[in-house]
Amino acid sequence: VAAVGTGVIVVLGEKLNFKGRSLIKNSFNLNSLGGMIRFLRSLFVATFIIESIGAALSFPVFIQQYTWWDALGISCFHSIAAFNNSGFDILGTGESLAAYTHHIWLNVVTISLIFLGGIGFLVIYEVWNEKWFWRTWSLNTCTSIFMGTTILIIGAILLKFTESFSWLNAFFYSMSARTAGFATIPLSSFAPVTMMTMLILMFIGAAPGSTGGGIKTTTLFVLLMRIRKAVTNKPEEMFHYSIPNSAFRKASIVFFMGLFVVYVSTYLVLMTNPHIPFL
């Protein structure tokens, strides 16, 4: 929302004031106020390219069941929904992507779009400009990619061994559960341990400055680094960067505030709706 609003201001020829620059800086976890217009331009271009590619890759799947125009519209909508981690169902069946549970191509495309939307625009911007030379990336970019990939793999392994999933479904739900909300299998059929695993994934969420929610993968990373230091007495360093104490304080606040909000919300829902099961 901040990016679109600021983009409209720029298109109309208005200057981006300090307040607007600060809003963009905080929204996308930028390091400085410089190069804001270039960042926004790259953001819109990268988003358009990624969503267009996603729609083009999804089109051959939907054209098999829908007319040309319907397939085009569904492909575009699905690509945008996946990249923005919204999980909207446009198929009209009320079952999300259940009809494509075993469709490898569409599942992989959807996972890829969710992943790209969930690692954050700043990450995409840095990778786009640094030409994949990871040693020049910021700590945020390195951490977002590392944690996003690690959580995806660990989540898939846990889901695979707690439910009778195929590896395709395990990776799909490990990715979708964190922020997107797409479903290829009815959630009502899941075991309690599977639901608990998905709750943890949802609580973690995506990277800062992304289209996803949660406490953020970087928050979890900072807390894990502090735990490692307490156990091994090794310095809090990763990817040739050291982690300042201020980052740990912020991560702790976000983590415990997240737990508090989830607990209070769950308590109120269970209290006002006693007929709803806990899991």
Report the location of each language-model feature:
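Membrane-proximal intracellular helices of multi-pass ion channels
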Residues: 1-279
